Amino acid sequence: MAAVVRRMGPVWWGLTPALDLQMHLHPPPPPEIYCSCSDDLPELNILLVGGGDGRHILKTICQASRWPHRKLKFFIIESDLELLARHMLFLSLALEHPEQMGLQEKSELFLELFGNSLIRNKTASYLQEKSELFIRYVTDPDYQQSNVPLLNLSSIKFKERDKLEDIFKFWRNADPKLFPIDKYWDEKNRQNLGRRYDSRKGAYDWDLSMKLHDRGAGVINSREYNYWREKGVAFMNREGVYDIPNKTLASQMVVPQSSGKVLARGYWGDITASPYIAFGIETEEESLLQTANGVHVKSAQDIAQHNMISLFHELAYGKIYSVPASGQAESELAKTDSDYKTNEEQTVGLITLNNVEIHFLPRFNNFFNLLYFSCSMVHFLKPEYKFIAASKATLVLELTKFMVDLQTEKLQDYVTIVAKLAQEAGFTPTETIDWKTDYIAKFERAHDS
């Protein structure tokens, strides 16, 4: 497909914490560098190449009220259509009106679909019902625009729409045997660990303490990390049985077999870094980062849950979330414990975002104020990208700090490589890159490029 390239597995969750991209513009651009909208509201055009999970989009949208009023336009290029499908799912979930779904329920549902190999029955029902809606979105553009006008699918070709429809039909199918992810997870674990598989708990502990903890993700505790490494279940925020495969983690890839190369569906994503990096290791609520005797009091799950509640609160109400006093519970958090309403039962519309647009697969020149490349897609950063970057555009590159499988010297080498790629593409660093502490690197379009 156009602007979609195959690599070794999709990035279901990113390798760096979610960013409010407006915070990383360097320097904060004056209004005159923005493109002008018909309503004279300044635009900020953001290109995301290989963002994967939409975490940067979500955080930037949710925290937009903290910044001068402007129209945000996101342009998305992904390696796999399944990632675009997940973008649609998480965006739709984020926009569920608080009268329809409380913040607690929404946050738990998001994290469950985001980072769990296995989900609860009512979560699976929600996914099936949403899939029915998404099928109509990709097959009926007028219906999609009338319901979710901020999502622009006009650049997606008919062939790609057909493939998206097939993905959503697969999600809609309730048969758990179609995607035995517990089997796929174990097979990938065995392949990754090799002879260490029989002593895998020690391998898990080593990766956590000597890699993730040493690189700044100390809030992830061994209990949650080991359980995720073993089962693929990262978030269990409520009592329930997690036994239904999360089909949003399924993708197809060409694999070699005795009969030749075949297209196989399976789980081809991460099994070492964890979904905790995206939302669970940083927070504005400092009390969640407290330690006792050198051990974090709260877990990465606790932090992720708080962060999602905070983001969804800010999206719905336009103000920063405050933690309730001890012993108190805000009514907006716990809307209902019953099953989520089906599409037919919904009487409340989605949260309206008038000044946000999300486009898939763009092609523009001298246009983008901010460009983001994930570490899995940075090799596509070519000199030609300087022609689509606006004057003084910011380039943000994801680094490999939390990539467990890389040794120290590889982390250093990667920084050198991406700095050279950025320079060749016409960008200069805005600050010194420290491979030990930084998980992103920032550059600015050179004046003479």
From Swiss-Prot:
InterPro entries reported in the protein's UniProt record: DNAAF3, DNAAF3_C, DUF4470
Q: Where in the sequence is the signal peptide annotated? A: none
Q: Has UniProt tagged this entry with the keyword Cytoplasm? A: yes
What is the protein's major site of localization?
A: cytoplasm
Q: An example Gene Ontology cellular component term from the record?
A: dynein axonemal particle
Q: Biological process GO terms, please?
A: axonemal dynein complex assembly; motile cilium assembly
Q: Does the keyword Zinc apply?
A: no
Query: According to the lineage, what is the superkingdom?
Result: Eukaryota
Q: Which UniProt keywords apply?
A: Cilium biogenesis/degradation, Cytoplasm
Compartments in which it is found? Cytoplasm; Dynein axonemal particle
Family matches, as PANTHER family: DYNEIN ASSEMBLY FACTOR 3, AXONEMAL, DYNEIN AXONEMAL ASSEMBLY FACTOR 3
Q: Which protein family is named in the record?
A: Belongs to the DNAAF3 family.
What is the stated purpose of this protein? Required for the assembly of axonemal inner and outer dynein arms. Involved in preassembly of dyneins into complexes before their transport into cilia.
Q: What is this protein called?
A: Dynein axonemal assembly factor 3
Query: Which organism's genome codes for this protein?
Result: Xenopus tropicalis
